[in-house]
């Protein structure tokens, strides 16, 4: 039997000061052009927390709106706030920056995150009201230290500053004098990713109703890497996040594949469960501070707010078949192989058409495709176009090429089988994963039967190969008893018969 998707959680962290101080577009600009007009104008384009919460794609990400409802809104969305928008959503929340800095400290096992005493005193009462973090996490927040000590660490000791509302409120210290892999900059990135994964895991426990000790394995699939100079990406971020999230009975490991990593991780998790190795596997990823404000130059130049101001995170729970939740069908897995090639048509053929043909299915047998769900509000002003729509056009074009669809039906195909994008451009975050929760619910509600989750990644960014990458799988309605009949087991009588026959054959061979 296949494994099933039992629950999903999605979280965002509003991080406006991290946009300014930690996003690589901004840190690079301060090196090459420190007096640029862009850096001067940037603060005027930063959104408030309330504005980020009321942003329709963000409300969609945490489950307060569906992709269909977002698609009914006229674009662009940045100047159309959602009335009555809330921090909490069906699948998670949008955490404010000040609370997240305390969560980063709680996620730090080596006393690297230091926070201002007054800032902690002001912020901790708000975090104590969080319904999902628990005293075991809150107890890890320290009382704080003097502002003068914080300023000295940043100005004289190579520490990386932590800011809120434009004010220095803490720092991340380096963990080694000469090891660049343990620099304050790298540790800040890793701790932010870890803390956002912790938040996603805590929400997953809530949405699933599963006890922390029931989760046996965690796969982390972000784009960060932790290690020292002797093993730069040694890991293990999965186990590190599981520790803080309270998953005391879990082990785990990391999966990397740029933007395709989540889909690789989902397939691996489903395989581990189907094989019986583990009963409950969580897949999670935190956000990327480096990508904050990645396209902000274009946004600022065009008079738009900086829309890449949130860290993204998610977690999904994959368990043994319960006869109810949607199956992850491992008989329909698309893969971009070494020999596939990198043309868009070759990529989509390998990920969509080929696995469906092997399963005796057609493209239009899939109700919804989820691929590269980047928010077009972000990508279109930056010149990258509408990325999800480009994917759905290519899939529709394949349907035309194979004779499934008339050319005149292409737009209708995109509307019926595609969707708008809503995910922040956090690399691994948009790549199919944000639709998992919505797909599960739509299948349970009888609104559809099959969705294909598509992960795509650009491996050339690591400068080790020019290869593209991708993997896909189908999430489908649970077939329950019907599947049992199609996959019968072997009865005890049949086993006894086979043993008896084997013994007779062995005896005959001995006589000869």
Question: Where do the model's predicted regions map?
Answer:
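Condensing-enzyme catalytic core mediating Claisen C-C bond formation in acyl metabolism
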Residues: 1-191, 298-363, 416, 455, ...
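Conserved catalytic cysteine-centered active-site region
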Residues: 167-180, 184-188, 227-268, 272-279, ...
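Conserved beta-ketoacyl condensing-enzyme motif
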Residues: 193-252, 256-257, 362-393
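Short acidic, glycine/serine/threonine-rich loops at helix termini
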Residues: 229-232, 264-267, 292-298, 380-383, ...
């Amino acid at each position: 039997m296949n494994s099933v998707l039992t629950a999903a959680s999605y979280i965002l962290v509003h991080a406006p000061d991290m946009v300014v101080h930690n996003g690589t577009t901004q840190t690079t600009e301060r090196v090459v052009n420190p007096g640029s007009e862009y850096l001067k104008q940037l603060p005027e384009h930063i959104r408030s927390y309330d504005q980020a919460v009321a942003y329709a794609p963000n409300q969609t990400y945490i489950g307060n709106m569906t992709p269909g409802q977002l698609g009914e809104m006229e674009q662009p969305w940045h100047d159309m706030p959602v009335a009555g928008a809330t921090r909490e959503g069906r699948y998670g929340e949008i955490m404010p920056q000040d609370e997240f800095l305390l969560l980063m400290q709680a996620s730090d096992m080596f006393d690297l995150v230091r926070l201002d005493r007054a800032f902690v005193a002001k912020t901790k009462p708000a975090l104590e009201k969080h319904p999902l973090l628990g005293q075991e996490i809150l107890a890890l927040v320290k009382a704080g230290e003097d502002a003068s000590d914080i300023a000295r660490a940043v100005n004289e000791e190579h520490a990386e500053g932590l800011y809120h509302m434009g004010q220095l409120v803490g720092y991340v210290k380096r963990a080694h004098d000469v090891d660049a892999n343990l620099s304050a900059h790298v540790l800040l990135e890793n701790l932010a990713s870890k803390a956002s994964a912790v938040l996603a895991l805590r929400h997953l426990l809530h949405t699933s109703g599963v006890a922390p000790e029931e989760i046996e394995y965690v796969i982390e699939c972000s784009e960060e890497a932790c290690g020292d100079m002797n093993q730069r990406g040694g890991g293990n971020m999965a186990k590190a996040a599981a520790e803080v999230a309270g998953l005391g009975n879990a082990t785990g490991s990391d999966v990397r594949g740029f933007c395709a990593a989540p889909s690789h991780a989902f397939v691996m998790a489903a395989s581990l469960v189907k094989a019986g190795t583990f009963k409950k596997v969580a897949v999670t990823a935190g956000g990327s501070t480096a990508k904050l404000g990645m396209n902000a130059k274009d946004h600022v130049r065009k008079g738009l707010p900086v829309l890449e101001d949130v860290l993204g995170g998610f977690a999904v729970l994959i368990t043994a078949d319960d006869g109810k939740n949607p199956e992850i069908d491992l008989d329909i897995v698309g893969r971009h192989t070494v020999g596939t090639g990198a043309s868009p048509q070759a990529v989509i053929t390998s990920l969509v058409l080929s696995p469906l043909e092997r399963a005796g299915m057609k493209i239009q047998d899939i109700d919804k495709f989820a691929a590269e769900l980047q928010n077009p509000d972000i990508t279109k002003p930056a010149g990258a176009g509408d990325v999800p729509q480009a994917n759905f056009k290519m899939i529709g074009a394949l349907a035309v090429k194979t004779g499934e669809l008339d050319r005149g039906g292409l737009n209708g195909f995109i509307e019926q089988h595609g969707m708008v994008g809503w995910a922040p451009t956090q690399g691994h975050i948009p790549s199919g994963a944000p639709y998992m929760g919505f797909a599960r619910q739509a299948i349970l509600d009888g609104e559809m039967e099959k969705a294909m989750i598509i992960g795509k990644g650009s491996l050339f960014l690591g400068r080790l190969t020019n290869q593209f990458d991708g993997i896909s799988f189908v999430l489908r309605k649970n077939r329950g008893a019907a599947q049992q009949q199609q996959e019968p087991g072997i009865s005890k009588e049949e086993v006894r018969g086979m043993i008896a026959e084997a013994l007779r054959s062995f005896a005959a061979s001995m006589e000869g």
